[in-house]
Amino acid sequence: MRSVIRRAGLGAALLLAFAASAMAQTGEPPKTGIATFSGGCFWCVEADFDKVAGVITTTSGYTGGHAVNPTYEQVSRSGTGHAEAVEIAYDPAKVSYEKLLDVFWHNIDPLAKNAQFCDHGDQYRTAIFYHDDQQRRLAQASKDALQARFEDPIATQIVPAGPFYKAEEYHQDYHAKNPIRYKFYRFNCGRDARLEQLWGKKD
């Protein structure tokens, strides 16, 4: 038993040494990327990104406005300037920001201004909130490429990321906590029907 414990202790020490060596070589701990998108109802956006390999966490919240610590009721009434949005933590070694942009575009109606499907109001506007200049350039390039596909102008904004306020807990992972209600809402809102019109059937 003691020899097993010693071997286990040695293994743990080696793992710690390896991690310390890796950090010393890079000069920083492993990086996690952050992406922020608004695409209408955050229940649906969160559900779509939860399916993407390389996404670590998704958080529903509010951003893009002026009110501090807004509530769902305040944002729903408009006047806060905030949009329902999702903040995504991802592993850049497993999924690129370009891939996240592609997922975003194919799960929204980019032609709708201040609305998405059955939901209307500036809180449902679509936007890409960039966190650095590289994200800004990639977002703009993807929007420009997409515009060539449509006659109508793309309404999606590309704006700097600002404070992100986490939504109430009952909104987090709503699709997993309340699958029947979520599917009922998504179907009746016409989200997937409109997405199929825009992008074709998903594989």
Question: Can you say where each PLM-predicted feature lies in the sequence?
Answer:
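Flexible coil/turn and secondary-structure edge motifs
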Residues: R2-S3, S21-D203
